[in-house]
Curated annotation (Swiss-Prot):
It comes from Neosartorya fischeri (strain ATCC 1020 / DSM 3700 / CBS 544.65 / FGSC A1164 / JCM 1740 / NRRL 181 / WB 181). The keyword Protein biosynthesis applies. Belongs to the eIF-3 subunit L family. The lineage of its organism: Eukaryota, Fungi, Dikarya, Ascomycota, Pezizomycotina. This is Eukaryotic translation initiation factor 3 subunit L. It holds the Pfam family Paf67. Residues 257-452 form the PCI domain. Component of the eukaryotic translation initiation factor 3 (eIF-3) complex.
Amino acid sequence: MSYEERVNAHPNLGDESDVEEEALVNDYREQVNFDDGMSELERTTSLGTGSQTQDLQAQLAAAATPLEYQATLETKFASYDNYCSLFHYILNSEGPVELEVPSYYWAWDVIDEFIYQFESFCRYRNRVARSGSNEEEAQLLRENPNTWGCYSVLNVLYSLIQKSQINEQLAAIKRGEDPLAFAGEYGSRPLYKMLGYFSIIGLLRVHCLLGDFSLALKTLDDIEMNKKAMFARVMAAHFTTYYYVGFSYMMMRRYGDAIRMFSHILVYVSRTKNFQKGGNSYDAIAKKNDQMYALIAICVALHPTRLDDTIHSALREKYGEQLLRLQHGGPDALPLFEELFRSACPKFISPTPPDFDNPALNIDPVDHHTAIFMDEVKNTLYNPTIRSYLKLYTTMDLKKLAGFLEVQPEVLRSWLLVNKQRSRQVRWVEGGLLEGEVVSANDLDYALENDLIHVSETKAGRRLVDWYLRNLARVY
């Protein structure tokens, strides 16, 4: 069971060609019936008994095994101790640990499960502190503030990255140089290289869960978002990467880039769904798909744009009436924005332990980030209505438009200024994920000269050549 299976219970950034998509689809065929051969390994309690290699394999296999959903608090503490023992041995042994990992799928499962248990423990601890109903568990959690602590988890991920020198290796690959020249004694071993690589994806996820979206994107500076990337070979890692990158872009108001991220992974999933049927993760991916469509519906409402035909059809099928309500804006759309956001956002966590002595002071991180997002939605709530009026004129008096909208002229002026500022978005062109150029996100622009509004509209023609090439490739 992977991360997606528990949700809700639990390249190049430009348009990719169908040839590249087909390569990803073909690669996924190899993953459907994948078996890493480690299912027979039993959990061990010590790395010092028996064969050291076999013990380490057993520890890694146990680390990749999901914890039971109703696990007790003592079991969660024990799981944390086991992870500490495992990573301490890998990171602090005299010289590299000699072990050939069976596959990169396995390395991803270890990091994925490690972060999932951290995330679920933080949510559980916050829930106990806020309810104040179980004093025995609250006391146990109060006495162990560092168990599954944020610092400990981040320290493990950063240490694995540093030990493997994976960032230096990835940077060398981008320069066309030999990565082994920069790998060092540890990074040349598959165990360290794979754990280090997927720790980068893990950092993206953790920083996003903590609400630091710019740092989340910064962690991927040395990873190229294309079909050749290692994460693209593992369905769960591929899905996770694009989901968290897209969500981070959305929270940074880079809606165009967020739509591109979501569209990529949704098209990929739609093309591989026949291979997923019957697999253990099919239901989980289907649920996560609905979340992705909810996020793309939000982005399209805040940033109207043309979508891929496949995405557009599926979006109208899933959220047809709701999408229209979002696009019309106004106060009636606020509850729908909040509902979709809550259903599709990550399960945010707090970086610090809660205050068990004052339960009322503990804020739900999901509520906190939802409130931040809804403040942004409220700023742009009347943009669709204002836009519909401005499209009818080349010049218009501010007071006249205020009369149409039944608001005070100065209130309208503030709306117009906010709308114009929000229409300037950073859009990725090349380089790191945080880089980009400031562009106008709308085909409607205006300027204020005292009380006179000057309106200009530019419509980009559809790129018919690209459309024909894309559809011909699908037919032939």
